[in-house]
Swiss-Prot record:
One Gene Ontology term, aspect cellular component: DNA-directed RNA polymerase complex
The keyword Signal belongs to this UniProt entry's keyword annotation: no
Protein EC: 2.7.7.6
Protein name: DNA-directed RNA polymerase subunit beta'
Residues at which Zn(2+) 1 binds: C70, C72, C85, C88
One Gene Ontology term of the molecular function aspect: magnesium ion binding
Binding site for Mg(2+): D460, D462, D464
Length: 1407
């Protein structure tokens, strides 16, 4: 009976677990895993191939080699199951136990585990508070360590050399205890009292003030507490028993010719066993100390190599000079256990083949070769054959399929019907890289792919291959059909625009059929409808392009969503009328009544989806494709050499440019311009010439002159094939046509600099040898770049996925009122992105009011769809506060309202959607399109940088924000604030343009004044920074002593003299401490106060400042007192493209970041040191001033006595995101990162929705540093998960206690991935050893919240359809129900019964 119970217990699967804990293994635990001790280094007998007894492959310890058969062959078959053979001692069971049964080795001397010793920071070193060097010297038998000092003057843990030890031994005898080797370290660890040590350290922490000491102490406290809380014992970091991996995980395979292939682990284990046995023997023989010591050291090294080869000293190599793969190497890296077997697996029921076009397929179909289908669906076919009674057994069915009998094909047809397959093209950069289709059987061996899904797969038909997978279970088929079918993935998850968009031939065909032509056959007819138009065209009575009137019936949706017909006569062409026949009801005719290019077609599909929904759009897309292909064939568009028309003016333009270049060369030789200026000018001249040539060429291609019906000449858009292809967006661009028929233009060298001699020829004329060489020179760089780019982009995607993988939508509404203000993106005079594009699909965080009133336009918590956005535009709303994932209050995951619309589906996001992964893919996927190049500012760009005025483009009124200004003597405004913005507002109050205005700019128009388009509203000198007085009065020089602090210089050309302030380095000793300044006094000589303060108006002058006033002159407010020359910013490289995106997400500090004000207050300068200035900010409220040392060469934007706000820029430069977070808060840093990333993508014309970047930013902000612990259990300065602090504070506040105060941290994506709560996820990402060591010591629990952890433990992921499963488990656990018990299968039951009966027959209880 006992056996029966045992059997039933063993049948229940123990799959139900909620978390995984990692901890140190105690020696007893290792013994409890083990099935026996491995005593011999032998593996298998090379003659009989049987495993040696007690060896590394011993059958007695690890289990039988053959199923249900003992080694000597006494017991065979199932009936002896569970018997232990008395001859060979092997249990009769399945051979797969050799994969799970472990053994152990009893070590003769303890050895340290290398991970806890050498993985930095060394855990053993930190725990004992001893330097790693010393511990290593003890472990590897170079010195002694004192364990008990006794009554002597020796300290515990003191290190003694051999001589010192012998001296001490003579002096004290056995009063004290000192040892060497791992035993000594073990004894030290064993005798530690962790709790008392903790108390002591906490006391020290409260007493000490030094920063470094505090850091060290907190580290130790954290480690000690981890040991106390996890129940790990410190001495377990020293191994006394070594576990042995099951033999089938370190196989030994006989090759032919009597050789063996073996896993490296066997070699490493053999060395350990050999040395261990030798040591045992030496100890038994009581060998001399020095020999034993050497053997112990060698054992330590052998164990080190087994655990992590190469971490200490040289790696042990095999016979072929390659380092052996240790246990640590088995789990880390791309080929390790995590990434090779747990996160990525090979799958059954899959095949791959080349793809070709399937233009006749429907959108949801793919062509599957019969051969492949037969192989993939074999089990289904066998099942069907048996079900029909066509085959009696599976074996017979197999035979039938092999013979390929006729009936098999009919059955294959049945099986395949309604059974979707998945198609995948590597690299799978986003979720549209795997889609489901219904297979259609075809002859041939290539998979046929629908042309419209090529864009999503990024596939072309030049030999690409794709893989097919068969979803087997019913659930999988359901998901494939409902979620992954290509017809359900019409919109791109990255930006919510259609991704199923016709391209190339289809676009050309539609463009051709919707073009109009002057005086075509049949012009001026009036037709009864599209049907008649098609009849006339087919019968050759009317041309496709003829301008005609057609009666068109449009359908419009009324308020109830019913379709209402409306008929009218339209001016159109025959082709457009024919195209109208396939447009679904409900769309306006205006949508096809134009020459349709790629953009127009995309817009048409988008409109169709938004108005009519999914099904009509899919049918429409298919119809568009068939029509496009048909008319592209009809058009007969082809490219001949005569289509490349070279403009006549080309030679004239080129000779003019050459003359200009010659002139500049002369100026250079006569020394009037520098080499750099000459180079820049030459490049400008050629760039301008190139533009002129290409303009002439395009004008030439674009139009042709024809005779119209009245016999007059008329210009019309040309039907030149090359022009049509470019104009429609089918293929090619103006730049490419320019190279064909204009001039090739300027070429770049591989380092990105431009070669100043352009290629004046084009491809039609042909290149000479020199030109050909120049053009290959730069082109090769492009190819090398592409290869690098792909790898880099893939790595960026991997890091992004890793940081965001556990972010899932977990609730509907977190109830927060927080959000971010959305305004249109305006750069200079252009609206780069209008407000509607930014808020579309977001949820409002607060009521949006009608501008100028208190009426609510859009209530809070409204999902802004297209209609709402139209309403916002009509009311010219300028800024909307929307919910954002960055400010979402959900603890684990985010809520649906903060995320908004699911871009790929068009409704609010569902719970369980894995938004983190979607965001990562959306940002990573276009990565390959970004440039790798970091571009230098060269040529035209550098002159544009030195702007000196603002000229507005539109008319409107001026609005200045954060501005301080004074009026000068001529009544103009002079700006005296730092980050002033000038906006142009149109009559509806919408911002049209926005400019930055520098300090000292003179405004022509004031705040709120009207300006006309093209008017200049502000001027300034770009090369100097003025010092402007805010008061009127008389100038009084202070500390300005000629020769000491200033020097007089006279300009040679004008003869005017000016004073120049000396740098402190140039001053004499007496002038070092003087501070030259200009004071403003009134006529009586009293100080004038700055208005609104009680500070006298005096302006301190920095070094190099130029003063053109004399002492005692009268000045008025707004005048320039002095000018500080600005060294031009040099050519700082702008990092662009992919590296810039990576820098932003890694939150790297820029080289010379902008210096921001840490607190608000008044600026003054303290005592200078040799190379630095001391900046002091004194708060107005009288709290402590803040000091900072700033290098002298940094240019400051502030003067003495100026008031700054916290977060203001003190010295220009690229801003460091950490500073923005610290000084301006979470929303500011979000805005900064989002805008910077978008700038890079916008340059490449890639559209990504802001919320994807916000999702990544949320993950970068997931840690917080504790500033003050309050009544919580956190340590001051500890970095913890933000959600944990929030939860802890909520509980504390509920109990009326003080919560912890914290500051948010910004981590780069790599750091953030490694700092996740889940150690499984972190270990599978990077630095596996370090992560696992840390986790084991702390005894971490992995709650399996993220996606990766669940994939690794082999569960459904808690997202998508798996979300419900996980919710259900949590609910059941909360209710305390038992998980559904797995049913025992019939065969298992019969087998176990047989086993029980056998055991009963054997009569002996082999326990």
């Amino acid at each position: 009976m006992k056996d029966l119970l045992k059997f039933l217990k063993a049948q229940t699967k123990t799959e139900e677990f909620d978390a995984i804990k990692i901890a140190l293994a105690s020696p007893d635990m290792i013994r409890s895993w083990s099935f026996g001790e491995v005593k011999k280094p032998e593996t298998i007998n090379y003659r009989t191939f049987k495993p040696e007894r007690d060896g590394l492959f011993c059958a007695r310890i690890f289990g039988p080699v053959k199923d249900y058969e003992c080694l000597c062959g006494k017991y065979k078959r199932l009936k002896h199951r569970g018997v232990i053979c008395e001859k060979c001692g092997v249990e009769v069971t399945q051979t797969k136990v050799r994969r799970e049964r472990m053994g152990h080795i009893e070590l003769a001397s303890p050895t340290a585990h290398i991970w806890f010793l050498k993985s930095l920071p060394s855990r053993i070193g930190l725990l004992l508070d001893m330097p790693l060097r010393d511990i290593e010297r003890v472990l590897y038998f170079e010195s002694y360590v004192v364990i008990e000092g006794g009554m002597t003057n020796l300290e515990r843990q003191q290190i003694l050399t051999e001589e010192q030890y012998l001296d001490a031994l003579e002096e004290f005898g056995d009063e004290f205890d000192a040892k060497m080797g791992a035993e000594a370290i073990q004894a030290l660890l064993k005798s530690m009292d962790l709790e008392q040590e903790c108390e002591q350290l906490r006391e020290e922490l409260n007493e000490t003030n030094s920063e470094t000491k505090r850091k060290k102490l907190t580290k130790r406290i954290k480690l000690l507490e981890a040991f106390v809380q996890s129940g790990n014992k410190p001495e377990w970091m020293i191994l006394t028993v070594l576990p042995v991996l099951p033999p089938d995980l370190r196989p030994l395979v006989p090759l032919d010719g009597g050789r063996f292939a073996t896993s490296d682990l066997n070699d490493l284990y053999r060395r350990v066993i050999n040395r261990n046995n030798r040591l045992k023997r030496l100890l038994d023989l009581a060998a001399p100390d020095i020999i034993v010591r050497n053997e112990k050291r060698m054992l330590q090294e052998a164990v080190d190599a087994l655990l992590d080869n190469g971490r200490r000293g040289r790696a042990i190599t095999g016979s072929n000079k390659r380092p052996l793969k240790s246990l640590a190497d088995m789990i880390k890296g791309k080929q390790g256990r995590f990434r090779q077997n747990l996160l990525g697996k090979r799958v059954d029921y899959s095949g791959r083949s080349v793809i070709t076009v399937g233009p006749y397929l429907r959108l949801h179909q793919c062509g599957l070769p019969k051969k492949m289908a037969l192989e993939l669906f074999k089990p289904f076919i066998y099942g069907k054959l048996e079900l029909r009674g066509l085959a009696t057994t599976i074996k017979a069915a197999k035979k039938m399929v092999e013979r390929e009998e006729a009936v098999v094909w009919d059955i294959l047809d049945e099986v395949i019907r309604e059974h979707p397959v998945l198609l995948n093209r590597a690299p799978t950069l986003h979720r549209l890289g795997i889609q489901a289709f219904e297979p259609v059987l075809i002859e041939g061996k290539a998979i046929q792919l629908h042309p419209l899904v090529c864009a999503a797969y990024n596939a072309d038909f030049d030999g690409d291959q794709m893989a097919v997978h068969v979803p087997l279970t019913l659930e999988a088929q359901l998901e494939a059909r409902a979620l992954m079918m290509s017809t359900n993935n019409i919109l791109s998850p990255a930006n919510g625009e259609p991704i199923i968009v016709p391209s190339q031939d289809v676009v050309l065909g539609l463009y051709y059929m919707t073009r109009d032509c002057v005086n075509a056959k049949g012009e001026g007819m009036v037709l009864t409808g599209p049907k008649e138009a098609e009849r006339l065209y087919r019968s050759g009575l009317a041309s496709l392009h003829a301008r005609v009137k057609v009666r068109i019936t449009e359908y419009e949706k009324d308020a109830n969503g019913e379709l209402v017909a409306k008929t009218s006569l339209k001016d159109t062409t025959v082709g457009r009328a024919i195209l109208w026949m396939i447009v679904p009801k409900g769309l306006p005719y205006s949508i096809v009544n134009q020459a349709l290019g790629k953009k127009a077609i995309s817009k048409m599909l988008n409109t169709c989806y938004r108005i009519l929904g999914l099904k009509p759009t899919v049918i429409f897309a298919d119809q568009i494709m068939y029509t496009g292909f048909a008319y592209a064939a009809r058009s007969g568009a082809s490219v001949g050499i005569d289509d490349m028309v070279i403009p006549e003016k080309k030679h004239e333009i080129i000779s003019e440019a050459e003359a200009e270049v010659a002139e500049i060369q002369e100026q250079f030789q006569s020394g009037l311009v520098t080499a750099g200026e000459r180079y820049n000018k030459v490049i400008d001249i050629w760039a301008a010439a190139n533009d002129r040539v290409s303009k002439a060429m395009m004008d030439n291609l674009q139009t042709e002159t024809v005779i119209n019906r009245d016999g007059q000449e008329e210009k019309q858009v040309s039907f030149n094939s090359i022009y049509m292809m470019a104009d429609s967006g089918a293929r090619g661009s103006a730049a490419q046509i320019r190279q064909l028929a204009g001039m090739r233009g300027l070429m770049a060298k591989p380092d990105g600099s431009i070669i100043e001699t352009p290629i004046t020829a084009n491809f039609r004329e042909g290149l000479n040898v020199l030109q050909y060489f120049i053009s290959t020179h730069g082109a090769r760089k492009g190819l090398a770049d592409t290869a690098l780019k792909t790898a880099n982009s893939g790595y960026l995607t991997r890091r992004l996925v890793d940081v965001a993988q556990d972010l899932v939508v977990t609730e509907d509404d977190c109830g927060t009122h927080e959000g971010i203000m959305m305004t249109p993106v305006i750069e200079g005079g252009d609206v780069k992105e209008p407000l509607r594009d930014r808020v579309l699909g977001r949820v409002t965080a607060e009521d949006v009011l009608k501008p100028g009133t208190a009426d609510i336009l859009v209530p809070r918590n409204t999902l802004l769809h297209e209609q709402w956005c139209d309403l916002l535009e009509e009311n010219s709303v300028d800024a909307v506060k929307v919910r954002s994932v960055v400010s979402c209050d959900t603890d684990f995951g985010v809520c649906a309202y903060c995320y908004g619309r699911d871009l790929a589906r068009g409704h609010i996001i569902n719970k369980g959607e894995a938004i983190g992964v979607i965001a990562a893919q959306s940002i990573g996927e276009p990565g390959t399109q970004l440039t790798m190049r970091t571009f230098h500012i060269g040529g035209a760009a550098s002159r544009a940088a030195a702007e000196s005025s603002i000229q507005v483009k539109n008319k409107g009124s001026i609005k200045l924000s954060n501005v301080k200004s004074v009026v000068n003597s001529s009544g103009k405004l002079v700006i005296t604030s730092r980050n002033t913005e000038l906006k142009l507002i149109d009559e509806f109050g919408r911002t049209k343009e926005s400019y930055k205005v520098p300090y000292g700019a003179v405004l022509a128009k004031g705040d709120g004044e009207q300006v006309a388009g093209g008017e200049t509203v502000a001027n300034w000198d770009p090369h100097t920074m003025p010092v402007i007085t805010e008061v009127s009065g008389f100038v009084r020089f202070t500390d300005m002593i000629d020769g000491q602090t200033i020097t007089r210089q006279t300009d040679e050309l004008t003869g005017l003299s000016s004073l120049v302030v000396l740098d402190s380095a140039e001053r004499t000793a007496g002038g070092k401490d003087l501070r030259p300044a200009l004071k403003i006094v009134d006529a009586q000589g009293n100080d004038v106060l700055i208005p609104g303060t009680d500070m006298p108006a005096q302006y301190f002058l920095p070094g190099k400042a130029i003063v053109q006033l004399e002492d005692g002159v009268q000045i008025s407010s707004g005048d320039t007192l002095a000018r500080i020359p600005q060294e031009s910013g040099g050519t700082k490289d702008i990092t662009g493209g992919l590296p810039r995106v990576a820098d932003l997400f890694e939150a790297r500090r820029p080289k010379e970041p902008a210096i921001l004000a840490e607190i608000s207050g008044i600026v003054s300068f303290g005592k200078e040191t040799k190379g630095k200035r001391r900046l002091v900010i004194t708060p107005v409220d009288g709290s402590d001033p803040y000091e900072e040392m700033i290098p002298k060469w940094r240019q400051l934007n502030v003067f003495e006595g100026e008031r700054v706000e916290r977060g203001d820029v003190i010295s220009d430069g690229p801003e460091a995101p950490h500073d923005i977070l610290r000084l301006r808060g979470v929303h500011a840093v979000t805005r900064y990162i989002v805008n910077e990333v978008q700038d890079v993508y916008r340059l490449q014309g890639v559209k990504i929705n802001d919320k994807h970047i916000e999702v990544i930013v949320r993950q970068m902000l997931r840690k917080a540093t504790i500033v003050n612990a309050g009544s919580s259990d956190f340590l001051e300065g500890e970095q913890v998960e933000y959600s944990r602090v929030k939860i802890a504070n909520r509980e504390l506040e509920a109990n009326g206690k003080v919560g912890a105060t914290y500051s948010r941290d910004l981590l780069g994506i790599t750091k953030a991935s490694l700092a996740t709560e889940s150690f499984i996820s972190a270990a599978s990402f990077q630095e596996t050893t370090r992560v696992l060591t840390e986790a084991a010591v702390a005894g971490k629990r992995d709650e399996l919240r993220g996606l990766k952890e669940n994939v690794i433990v082999g569960r459904l992921i808690p997202a998508g359809t798996g979300y419900a499963y996980h919710q259900d488990r949590m609910r059941r656990r909360a209710a305390g129900e038992a998980p559904a018990a797995p049913q025992v299968t019939a065969e298992d039951a019969s087998a176990s019964l047989a086993e029980l009966l056998n055991a009963g027959l054997g009569g002996s209880d082999n326990e």
